[in-house]
Amino acid sequence: LETDAIDPTRPRVLVTGASGFIGQALCRLLPAEDWDTRVLLRDAHRSDCLPAELQADVIVADLNSQTGLLKACADRDIVLHLAGQAHVAAVSAEVEVNPDVRAVTNLVAAASEQKVRRIVLLSSSLAHAAETRQGDITAYGEGKLAVEAELIAAAQKGQLEAVILRAVNVYGVGMKGKIASMISMIIRGSLPPLPLLSNRVSLVGSQDLARAIIQAATSAEAKGKTYTVTDGAAYSISEIESAIYAALGRQMPGWRAPPMILYAASALAGLFSRLGLRKGSISSRTYRNLTMDNLFDNAAICGDLGFNPRDNLYAVLPEIVESLVTPNS
């Protein structure tokens, strides 16, 4: 592969996962870039999620269809690969072949055959835990690390360029995950006040993550790099909880649950879930995540690509809360 930068004026890009949470955020920004955009959708009906001003070419195919992938990758410079399992609870350690690994293997083969220059892979900070064997080690993170390895191997063979973006937990309207669950439970009045927690976590806004993806697509500096993407802030779970109550216009209760109660409730919920007695995302892992630091540094992507996060959870939180209070508005 040549090493000069991809022409940033009007690159030809393919977006997978365009109808997902991050994909929709990206597609809202792409019209301003005026790129030649194509999206790969598994379901034609999901094209309703795309902004009309995107004016994208739509290919309907599955990531397991080599014929569809070859068509999607034809005459593309860059693939922005956002498709895949988005949440820890969706991944089982018992799956023999990770579908995300199979998908990226198929995508790399098609992209290489069609002379695609670069793949930008949206991964997760949980891949870092799997890689270092420190922190929150999950089957999900192991799977993301395996996906990264497939892409890196192809890049090392000279088939294409690879850029990997490891996102921390993402916030924004339409978000899912633990913070969204916490907001919903507070709205319903089913979550008692948490213990006073001193741990800090990194987060990133969906729009900032979309901007990082755009920057990574055409930067010569990004070639072969793996970046962690955060908004640069260190958030306290207790401060987030207080901000949720404020966004709801509610008074924060004057008492807090003892830490042991939180641990026991999380462990019991996890046991019920494993026994099939109750479905839910709460487990002893929830307790660990609520009580341990989970901080990441974004200095590399800021320094290399000039990434400059604009959003902050507390500024976006009222809109997120409103969307969960009135989800159909």
Ranges and model annotations:
Residues H128-A129, V163-S181:
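Flexible, glycine-rich beta-alpha linker
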Residues S219-S281, N298, D304, D311-Y314, ...:
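Mid/C-terminal beta-alpha module of Rossmann-like enzyme folds, strongest
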Residues T138-V163:
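Active-site Tyr-X1-5-Lys
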Residues V13-E33:
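N-terminal Rossmann NAD(P)H-binding glycine-rich loop of SDR-like oxidoreductase domains
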Residues M175-S181, P195-A217, G224-T228:
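Substrate-positioning beta->alpha
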Residues A56-R102, A110, S125-Q134:
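NAD(P)H-binding glycine-rich loop region in Rossmannoid oxidoreductase-like domains
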Residues R102-E142, V163:
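Conserved Rossmann-fold NAD(P)-dependent oxidoreductase catalytic core, especially the SDR/UDP-sugar
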Residues T16, L40, V79-A83, I119-S125, ...:
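SDR active-site strand-loop-helix element
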